[in-house]
């Protein structure tokens, strides 16, 4: 199996979207120079992002911001600017750098931001994006203090313009069009499956498997594993239900909280003719012990994997007991329903 994985990833790396990372066929400079700021913001995307999404990077001049902005540009994402206080008026990776998000938005008509800012300052960066009324903020930063995120959550709930994905998440990608975050772009393939996950690495596993069986992905959203996040399963499912490109849905959850139960309730109440496959991590986790993510903890007898699995199965979801079975389970459902073309 490992040899098959290596061969597939190698072929994807050489044939995938964007420029080749090793050959550097197209330089960052030429990619950036081909972008025009335009005069109006882009139209709304079907599932949060698409080829028209115009992205700024908060923390662009830092190590992580530099590396992942470079990767995003090579993939084809419309990165239009960066924001670093006191460095306004300079350039980095061929992009203009501004002191504030408001200045960057006004100049470039950006509608999305990705945040690579250290944890003590990340909440302030999110609040700055909210104040600028961006459509989307993707916060990658891990370890933001919970009391900071309580303030952010209150601010999010008091408005309806801006959506936050994260924090502590891999980001979001529409394969072949827009990559915002730290996921390896080359393993993705444009296709039919919408993926939403609390786990970054398990997202990559689901991506690999749906690519391997020839289904590909429509949009992949990593919502993060913190107790206080901006986007949940229900938000993503509602988008996937009405997105014509999404023909199947993969949901990857874990112990802690009630997000998976809420998703099951939505599926049961609204119904969907799209096949849904789920995996819940933490089946053998002991109560009261945090398992990786800050939100991955069973407390007060609630949030167990067993409860989540039962709720999802009662809603008609195919729940697999191993992440290695996600792709095969989805392929079988497509076969049973005559959805393969």
From Swiss-Prot:
Residues 1-37 form a transit peptide. The active site is at residue 293. CoA binds at residues 61-64, 87, 140-142. One of its GO terms (biological process) is tricarboxylic acid cycle. Substrate binds at residue 204. It is found in: Mitochondrion. GO terms for molecular function: copper ion binding; nucleotide binding; succinate-CoA ligase (ADP-forming) activity. Its EC number is 6.2.1.5. Coiled coil: none annotated. It catalyses: succinate + ATP + CoA = succinyl-CoA + ADP + phosphate. It holds the Pfam family CoA_binding. Transmembrane segments: none annotated. Keywords: Ligase, Mitochondrion, Nucleotide-binding, Transit peptide, Tricarboxylic acid cycle. It is an enzyme of class 6 (ligase). Pathway: Carbohydrate metabolism; tricarboxylic acid cycle; succinate from succinyl-CoA (ligase route): step 1/1. GO terms for cellular component: mitochondrion. Heterodimer of an alpha and a beta subunit. Belongs to the succinate/malate CoA ligase alpha subunit family. Succinyl-CoA synthetase functions in the citric acid cycle (TCA), coupling the hydrolysis of succinyl-CoA to the synthesis of ATP and thus represents the only step of substrate-level phosphorylation in the TCA. The alpha subunit of the enzyme binds the substrates coenzyme A and phosphate, while succinate binding and nucleotide specificity is provided by the beta subunit. This is Succinate--CoA ligase [ADP-forming] subunit alpha-2, mitochondrial. It comes from Arabidopsis thaliana.
